[in-house]
Amino acid sequence: MIELTDEILAKVIKKRKKASYKGTYGRLLVIGGNRQYGGAAILVTTSAVYSGAGLVSVALAKENHSALQARLPEAMTLDFDDLIKLREVAKAADVIVIGPGLGLERLDLLTEVLNLLTENQKLVIDGSALTLFAREHLDLPFPENTVFTPHEMELERLSGLKIGQQTKEEVQDFVNQLGAIVVAKSSETRIFAPNRESFILKIGSPAQATGGMGDTLAGMVGGFLAQFHGETEEVVAAATYLHSLIASVLARKTYVVLPSRLIEEIPLFMKKYEC
């Protein structure tokens, strides 16, 4: 496994060109935020915006629109039950992030996205959508453009591998069959791509062990994929590394790293490492 260092940030994060506009940095759609899970939608959307995605829309339960708009006026909102509008926005997106706060009763939205997806779009599957995908044994239309972000229990559901069986070799074999990138979150997060050398993070902190941290990572991965066009595995690795790097720095002075606090630091760290 290749241990990730700051070099991945300098390789992926590019200085913005003078002659560019918001469309240059990608269109991203978040789908999640069911009635009781509005916070997840706020975190994933905010982290995508702060990571630099050019245009971010979020499809969520109508009850959560006001809270998100008050917190993040930079994002556009739509009702995830308005399928006509959802299809319109989804077709225009470069990246779709689905799952944070979605709820296990919204299989219909996941299947809708899988049916709409084109070969020119990237898909990040997280949270509830990951569990639904595993439970329903769904198929990926374009696995090479798909990223899963499971924690260990979600990886068990997805792969059938018990937590104690999730060795490098076993997970790599599963990923080779799946055909997609898998960010296997743990105390030493690993990033697997089909038939390629995997990455491992030796940084991070137990201060990250708090609700919403995974939502924040999903938004960062989506935001990076929307604007940076290198090797997909490396772009995902850079977002994942930066997430843990920021947490490690903040943990020097605070017992718990709140996702909202981590998000504030994203553009500052990106500026430091732009190349």
From Swiss-Prot:
Documented EC number(s): 4.2.1.136
Residues at which AMP binds: G214
GO molecular function annotations of the record: ADP-dependent NAD(P)H-hydrate dehydratase activity; ATP binding; NAD(P)HX epimerase activity
One of the GO biological process terms: nicotinamide nucleotide metabolic process
Domain of life: Bacteria
List of residues binding (6S)-NADPHX: A40, G103, H151, D215
Catalytic activities: (6S)-NADHX + ADP = AMP + phosphate + NADH + H(+); (6S)-NADPHX + ADP = AMP + phosphate + NADPH + H(+)
Disulfide pairings: none
Signal peptide: none
InterPro entries noted in UniProt: Carbohydrate_kinase_pred_CS, CARKD, Ribokinase-like
Record flagged with keyword NADP: yes
Domain YjeF C-terminal: 5-273
Lipid biosynthesis in keyword set: no
Keyword vocabulary terms for this entry: ATP-binding, Lyase, NAD, NADP, Nucleotide-binding
Cofactor(s) listed: Mg(2+)
Enzyme class: lyase
Biological role stated in the UniProt entry: Catalyzes the dehydration of the S-form of NAD(P)HX at the expense of ADP, which is converted to AMP. Together with NAD(P)HX epimerase, which catalyzes the epimerization of the S- and R-forms, the enzyme allows the repair of both epimers of NAD(P)HX, a damaged form of NAD(P)H that is a result of enzymatic or heat-dependent hydration.
Family listed: Belongs to the NnrD/CARKD family.
Summary of subunit composition and partner proteins: Homotetramer.
Name by which UniProt lists this protein: ADP-dependent (S)-NAD(P)H-hydrate dehydratase
Higher taxonomy: Bacteria, Bacillati, Bacillota, Bacilli, Lactobacillales
Gene that encodes the chain: nnrD
